[in-house]
Amino acid sequence: MARSLKKAPFVANHLLEKVERLNTQGDKKVIKTWSRSSTIVPLMIGHTIAVHNGREHIPVFITDQMVGHKLGEFAPTRTFRGHVKKDKKSKR
């Protein structure tokens, strides 16, 4: 279910403070975060945010097309190694 339009998008307070601080300084450092559920807002455009995927931090460069999506959408948690190929020779 989508979030109500009456409410503001969820962004973790600590993440929002770091982005605002870097915007005032004009700095473009990588921001590490575990907050996968935070929504990408226009303040974040141009920054690189390292999103935790359960094992490591995946750097995500924020563009204007990402606004409105969640940070966790861009850091996959599962690695797909492909399906097992059927081997007809071993069945004989």
Curated annotation (Swiss-Prot):
Family per record: Belongs to the universal ribosomal protein uS19 family.
Swiss-Prot/TrEMBL GO biological process terms: ribosomal small subunit assembly; translation
Segments forming a coiled coil: none
PROSITE patterns associated with the record: RIBOSOMAL_S19
Lineage: Eukaryota, Viridiplantae, Chlorophyta, core chlorophytes, Trebouxiophyceae
Alphabetical list of SUPFAM superfamilies matching this protein: Ribosomal protein S19
Function noted in UniProt: Protein S19 forms a complex with S13 that binds strongly to the 16S ribosomal RNA.
Disulfide linkage: none
GO CC aspect terms: chloroplast; mitochondrial small ribosomal subunit
Keyword set includes rRNA-binding: yes
GO molecular function: rRNA binding; structural constituent of ribosome
Keywords: Chloroplast, Plastid, Ribonucleoprotein, Ribosomal protein, RNA-binding, rRNA-binding
Localisation per UniProt entry: Plastid, Chloroplast
Predominant location category: plastid
Name by which UniProt lists this protein: Small ribosomal subunit protein uS19c
